[in-house]
């Protein structure tokens, strides 16, 4: 779908998606809110690859923005009071694309404190200059193997 060279995964967990992209030759960085993510990912992959800690409730600035920010099922874990900072972290560190999923109301899961409808998230991203790409989102939703992504994957492009 896209020809990007560099990707950041915000909320990468132990780094599975990040590592897969790394092995495919992408320049990729993974960031997670778990303060032990570096040790966890270093042990898991055991080849020098690791992810980094980031507190998404505080402003984050990377050296150079990434072409694509991947952020899957993270926003619902961020208290609403920090939602603006969280979204700003996505848009400020992206050159062009954001692939985002955000748990919808009543979606099962642990630690969900800030679920939103797709429409709400699309409008929030629009205010930051990101356009919802319906056709790319539909392709990704159809291809998703995890059922919740079929309702929550949203692909955004900077205007």
Where are these regions (language model features)?
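Active-site catalytic microenvironments for nucleophilic, acid-base chemistry
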Residues: 24
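Conserved class I S-adenosyl-L-methionine
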Residues: 5-13
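S-adenosyl-L-methionine-dependent methyltransferase catalytic module, highlighting the catalytic core
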Residues: 12-16, 20, 33-61, 66-71, ...
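Glycine-rich helix-loop-beta junction characteristic of Rossmann-like nucleotide cofactor-binding loops
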Residues: 1-3
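Conserved SAM-binding motif I beta-strand of class I
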Residues: 27-32
């Amino acid at each position: 779908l896209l020809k990007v060279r560099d990707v950041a995964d915000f909320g990468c967990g132990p780094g599975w998606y990040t590592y897969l992209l790394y092995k495919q030759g992408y320049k990729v960085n993974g960031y997670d809110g778990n303060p032990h993510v570096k040790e966890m990912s270093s042990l898991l992959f055991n080849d020098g690859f690791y992810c980094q800690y980031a507190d998404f409730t505080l402003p984050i600035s990377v050296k150079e923005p990434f072409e694509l920010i991947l952020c899957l099922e993270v926003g619902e874990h961020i208290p609403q009071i920090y939602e603006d900072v969280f979204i700003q972290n996505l848009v400020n560190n992206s050159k062009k694309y954001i692939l985002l999923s955000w748990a919808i109301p009543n979606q099962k899961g642990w630690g969900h404190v800030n679920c939103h409808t797709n429409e709400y998230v699309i409008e929030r991203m629009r205010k930051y200059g990101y356009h919802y790409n319906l056709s790319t989102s539909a392709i990704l939703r159809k291809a998703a193997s995890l059922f919740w992504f079929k309702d929550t994957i949203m692909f955004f492009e900077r205007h």
